Amino acid sequence: MFDNILEQQRIEKAKELKNLGINPYPHFLEKEMSLKTFKDRFSYILEQVEKRDESVNAVVAGRLKLLRIAGKSIFANIEDEDTNLQIYFSKDSVGEELYTILKKNLEVGDIVLVKGFPFVTKTGEFSLHASEVKLATKAIVPLPEKYHGLTDIEQRYRKRYVDMIMNAEVRKDFLVRSKVVSLIRHFFENKGFLEVETPMMHPIAGGANAKPFVTFHNSLGVERFLRIAPELYLKRLVVGGFEAVFEINRCFRNEGMDLTHNPEFTTIEFYWAYHNYKDLMDLTEELFALLLDKLNLGKTIEFDGKMIDFSKPFERITYKDALCKYGGLDRDLIEDKEKILTKLKADGFEANEKLELGHLQAELFDNYVEEKLINPTFVIDFPISISPLSRRSDEDSQIAERFELFICGRELANGFNELNDPLDQYERFLKQIEAKNAGDEEACEMDEDFVNALGYGMPPTAGQGIGIDRLVMLLTNKKSIRDVILFPAMRPLKSELKEKE
């Protein structure tokens, strides 16, 4: 560890500082303000003739990103989480002894505490004239080169801390993510929703069609499943009397990783008694309007080279109409299992003859429709067979009162009128068991306790989930989900695999 020559040189400098009575890792140093506050508060000197205010004695801190020695003075650039600032100090300003120590031992990457006053250099740069410089942390590992930075995409994800040091835009993206979560939370609180927390380990893998992660509870001697969705617990709370609930938390799905999928991801799920899925679509449009406004993004945003228009009401189109309009498929084809199988095979897609009509229609949708839904589009009225927890339509028993929101070819939200008939729910679970026995690893398990809860009566309720990660991708124009997750899942390095062997 820390065995390359540059790291060893820095370790020696840290030892030398200790020998001089300077702790390279002091337990506490207090700064007065951020660099942004310093710039904002003292910007008035830019309008003054003197271009300086020596009555100020401000204390700031930051990481050294640039260090330039010019004879008896040093110019440096420090950076905190918001911005950067040039600092200047000399033998005269900090004293010859300290100046000599700093000149010899300070390096790019070190974190310093600086006290001084604002001034403008001869070249016109707003700066801090330091009277005191203290080492807050000695960096042992050198930063990547300024102009090359951390360019290997895998290394950026594995060493997110270095990525954030080197790329201010990365920090900005995660500040946006934090703000998005905060805005969503306050949006629902202001609508009268109650935020709750439900279990992360489930006795039954339920709430969505997905393959779970399995763990083992040693004390109880039973298997547990990391949750794939909080849905069934949130609906139990509606049964219990909470009429509007939401949860922002993690879900886990033991499936593939790609540009839009990470095995660990964040969602908001919310349930609203005495409302229907049309109310949820209205609520979703209102939420998007709020986010675009508070993030100052305007009514049209760019994502992956495409312009997305939020100025108009979101399109609402039925599942079957979308197959025809966007998929270019004939109405008689989408209603005929054999014709669908023939079409899929002819176009080189997998065609499982064991699938029933609704699942085959879903194959058509995935392959011919989804990527063409660029502007915000609610696709409504899904096949009932692929919607095991949704309420059946009163007009058509093969249709679920369900929608999904698509933007730029990606699903961002899924909502529906909740199934509250316990007998119907029980039958749906039995069909899911049949599907699992036939080889569908993602089919739901039977959850008799949930059916029992419905037996006590759940009021007419609508529920929805929104993927926070994909939403942030959209709002920050990022193509990969790993760009909006601080520490995304990564494949093991070869060295890690060898150690296990």
Swiss-Prot record:
One of its GO terms (cellular component) is cytosol. It catalyses: tRNA(Lys) + L-lysine + ATP = L-lysyl-tRNA(Lys) + AMP + diphosphate. Mg(2+) 2 binds at residue 411. Signal peptide: none annotated. SUPFAM superfamilies: Class II aaRS and biotin synthetases, Nucleic acid-binding proteins. The keyword Aminoacyl-tRNA synthetase applies. One of its GO terms (molecular function) is lysine-tRNA ligase activity. It is found in: Cytoplasm. Binds 3 Mg(2+) ions per subunit. Transmembrane segments: none annotated. Its cofactor is Mg(2+). Homodimer. Belongs to the class-II aminoacyl-tRNA synthetase family. This is Lysine--tRNA ligase. It comes from Campylobacter jejuni (strain RM1221). The gene is lysS.
